[in-house]
Amino acid sequence: MVMLPLTSEQMTLIAVFILISHNLVQEGIIQAKSGIHPLKATLFRLIASVITVIIVAKFLRPDTLAVMSEGVSMAAAQPFVAMLKNWFIASFYLCIKMFLIIMALMILLGVMKSFNIIHHVVRVISPVLKAMGLNQKVGILWIAAAVFGIAYGAAVIVEEAKEGNFDRQELEKLHISIGINHSMVEDPALFLTLGLNAFWLWVPRLLTAVLAVHLFTLWHRIKSL
């Protein structure tokens, strides 16, 4: 299989785009079940991806243009049947992983509710939520998406959105934020293995999420005048 001769700059821009806009169908369905229209959520993410990549491209220095070939092995071509078998095995393990994570999250959430821990956790992160432009009430949903991602945190997000006393605008702001900036641990770590700068994997989409929510809030205020 031929390896594309991408530079570190190009890989960084691709990573930034993918970190914001990936798994759009599945995550769009999850977001639709918990407070925002899927097309609206997807459109926000795609626009945010394009704008963020354009801005990041302005800041990348020319000395990042070395082609990334060292340390990256080429994948050997596989027969179709073998490839299909490997895909089924990988998908099976992924399903088990998702099931275990979701079950663990639901059990943890139940324990936290029983001992009234959620209120204390949300209160601790309230300054972060305020900076993100989010209401403190959506704190547990934001934590689930930011740490575990929309897909893995789906059960918590959907369940809490249905049970919680959230208004439409609060949920829309939440989904704009987590749509752009979620799975802050696992997803960027995948690109770190390619030798990309950690700053560009975390900071741009975090700032984009903050800016997007505040602009959305401002637009609603102007609209209500």
Task: For every predicted segment, state its role.
Residues 46-129, 207, 211, 224-225:
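Selected transmembrane alpha-helices and immediately adjacent juxtamembrane segments
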